A protein has these predicted regions:
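Transmembrane-helix boundary/entry motifs in multi-pass membrane transporters
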Residues: 3-12, 41-47, 70-100, 117-123, ...
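Juxtamembrane transmembrane-helix boundary signature
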Residues: 20, 51-77, 259-262
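Membrane-interface loop-to-helix entry segments
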Residues: 111-115, 122-129, 137-171
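Extracellular loop-to-transmembrane helix junctions
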Residues: 8-11, 38-63, 240-250
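Small-residue-rich segments of transmembrane alpha-helices in multi-pass membrane proteins
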Residues: 19, 49-50, 82-93, 153-168, ...
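Hydrophobic, membrane-embedded alpha-helices of multi-pass small-molecule transporters
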Residues: 10-30, 49, 96-100, 104, ...
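Juxtamembrane interface elements at the cytosolic ends of transmembrane helices
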Residues: 26-36, 60-73, 133, 137, ...
Length: 309
């Protein structure tokens, strides 16, 4: 297959970086719940988790893209057979398909809950909206898909980065107090035995887990992009997207640490135990932001749901 977009283009690089960003982030990232469990819960060691994610995520995506560019797979899922052989590769193909399909319906549930919680809409309306938007985008083909989510993803990351920067500029002096609270388990409003949720027993397992579940999502997606784009455009896009996501994670994580015991408006929950911890950060920036933030979360779900199909 002849590659499209062969000439180097910064515009194309930005779109591809946006696609990487968009696929990696989702409702868990936008709400801040993923960042709490995979990074913030480990305090300063969360930076080591981030280093593990950055290295592994960058490594396998560059190699998936390289394989797609050089092998020109008839089907993107053939990348599993390329790496794992006929039998194991076929198993991985079916497993990843089922995994992505089930992940899509998790996204549908998240979209329905988001619009229901913020705007009081019936659950089925949020579900139908996401399914319809996803179907329309997927029907447009790979290039339309990449262009669509490649524009939305960076907007979400920029907003998250802005929340992180504003919060740290205002509350940076509270980071040490937050680190002490995490280390000593002194969380406001915690019941006996209750503590902050984490994704694994230590920062290493957390980092491998965070990059590992994304591997099943990205393998065929990167292989497909590799057949349609020049290596240089795609490599730069992968690097740029990975850096942008990592910067956003670091900023939001330390913003959460500085506000780990900050309560919501009625004091019933705090950043450490909130379902949507970033909403508390956003409301501290500007109270009416919660209504806008629900749209941001929905957009994050959309950008992750589209490539799953």
């Amino acid at each position: 297959m002849k590659q499209e977009h062969n000439a180097f283009s910064w515009k194309r690089v930005l779109i591809l970086a946006g696609a990487v960003i968009a696929f990696q982030i989702g409702s868990g990232f936008a709400t801040g719940q993923e960042i709490i469990q995979y990074y913030t819960a480990y305090g300063v060691e969360g930076l080591l988790t981030l280093a593990v994610f950055f290295g592994t995520f960058l490594y396998y995506n560059v190699n998936f893209a390289k394989a797609g560019a050089e092998e020109h797979f008839e089907k993107a899922n053939d990348i599993y057979r390329f790496y794992c052989g006929k039998y194991v590769g076929t198993f991985c193909d079916y497993y990843s398909t089922i995994f992505c399909y089930m992940s899509f319906w998790v996204m549908v549930g998240g979209a329905a809950s988001t619009l229901n919680q913020e705007y009081g809409l019936p659950l089925w309306i949020g579900a139908v909206i996401l399914v319809a938007l996803t179907a329309i985008t997927v029907a447009g083909g790979l290039e339309f898909l990449v262009d669509a989510i490649g524009l939305v993803g960076p907007i979400i990351v920029v907003i998250c980065i802005a929340i992180g920067i504003i919060t740290l500029f205002r509350d940076g002096g509270d980071i040490q107090a937050g680190l002490d609270a995490i280390k000593n388990g002194t969380f406001e409003g915690a019941k006996a035995g209750e503590t902050i949720k984490n994704a694994g027993p230590n920062w290493l397992i957390s980092g491998l887990s965070y990059s590992g579940f994304a591997l099943l999502w990205f393998a065929s997606f990167m292989a497909a992009l590799g057949t349609k784009n020049s290596k240089k455009n795609l490599y730069y896009g992968i690097i740029g997207g990975t850096i942008a996501v990592s910067v956003a994670i670091a900023l939001i994580s330390f913003a959460q640490i500085a506000n780990i015991n900050t309560p919501n408006a009625d004091g019933s929950i705090h950043v450490w135990d909130a379902a949507i911890p970033n909403l508390i950060l956003a409301m501290k920036v500007w109270k009416p932001f919660s209504a806008i933030f629900a749209v941001i979360v929905f957009a994050g779900i959309y950008t992750s749901a589209v490539p799953l199909l």
